[in-house]
């Protein structure tokens, strides 16, 4: 049973009226992905061959229809909009979570660790060399007394 009469459809803006002529509203829960009642804002799958069918309306046209429907207080009769799902299930981008950075920034920790290891190693070698040098000088020179 249609919700709108012809007079009511004629009073709506052209784009919104055309939408309700093509896809007459029943109730908000009536929009599904079944072939007999497809949501014109969402992509669906053909049950016979499994191919994806693009949405009937683009995101821009969806936004225009929703704006007009909100102005007329009819947005509850429209099917679920594609952009609503995008925001709620959006994944965090890898680049924002772990930014790539420059090579010097990415390898900074590794470079500092290598530098610290080399410095501690060189200090050990230096102290070892000094100790050997002192022992050698004590052995080589007899005490004058």
From Swiss-Prot:
It holds the Pfam family Mitoc_mL59. Its main location: mitochondrion. The keyword RNA-binding does not apply. Keywords: Mitochondrion, Ribonucleoprotein, Ribosomal protein. Residues 123-135 have a biased composition (Basic and acidic residues). GO terms for cellular component: mitochondrial large ribosomal subunit; mitochondrion. GO terms for biological process: mitochondrial translation. It is found in: Mitochondrion. GO terms for molecular function: structural constituent of ribosome. Residues 123-145 are annotated as: Disordered. Component of the mitochondrial ribosome (mitoribosome), a dedicated translation machinery responsible for the synthesis of mitochondrial genome-encoded proteins, including at least some of the essential transmembrane subunits of the mitochondrial respiratory chain. The mitoribosomes are attached to the mitochondrial inner membrane and translation products are cotranslationally integrated into the membrane. Belongs to the mitochondrion-specific ribosomal protein mL59 family. PANTHER family: 54S RIBOSOMAL PROTEIN L25, MITOCHONDRIAL (PTHR28041), LARGE RIBOSOMAL SUBUNIT PROTEIN ML59 (PTHR28041:SF1). Component of the mitochondrial large ribosomal subunit (mt-LSU). Mature yeast 74S mitochondrial ribosomes consist of a small (37S) and a large (54S) subunit. The 37S small subunit contains a 15S ribosomal RNA (15S mt-rRNA) and at least 32 different proteins. The 54S large subunit contains a 21S rRNA (21S mt-rRNA) and at least 45 different proteins. This is Large ribosomal subunit protein mL59. The lineage of its organism: Eukaryota, Fungi, Dikarya, Ascomycota, Taphrinomycotina.
């Amino acid at each position: 049973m249609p919700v709108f009469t012809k007079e009511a459809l004629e009073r709506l803006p052209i784009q919104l009226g055309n939408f309700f002529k093509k896809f007459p509203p029943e109730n908000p829960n009536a929009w599904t992905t079944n072939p007999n009642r497809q949501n014109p804002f969402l992509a669906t799958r053909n049950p016979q061959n499994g191919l994806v069918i693009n949405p009937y309306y683009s995101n821009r046209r969806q936004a225009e229809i929703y704006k007009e429907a909100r102005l007329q207080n009819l947005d509850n009769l429209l099917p679920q909009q594609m952009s609503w799902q995008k925001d709620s299930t959006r994944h965090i981008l890898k680049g924002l979570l772990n930014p790539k950075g420059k090579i010097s920034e990415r390898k900074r920790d590794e470079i500092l660790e290598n530098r610290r290891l080399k410095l501690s190693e060189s200090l050990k070698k230096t102290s070892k060399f000094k100790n050997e040098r002192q022992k050698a000088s004590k052995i080589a020179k007899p005490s004058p007394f």
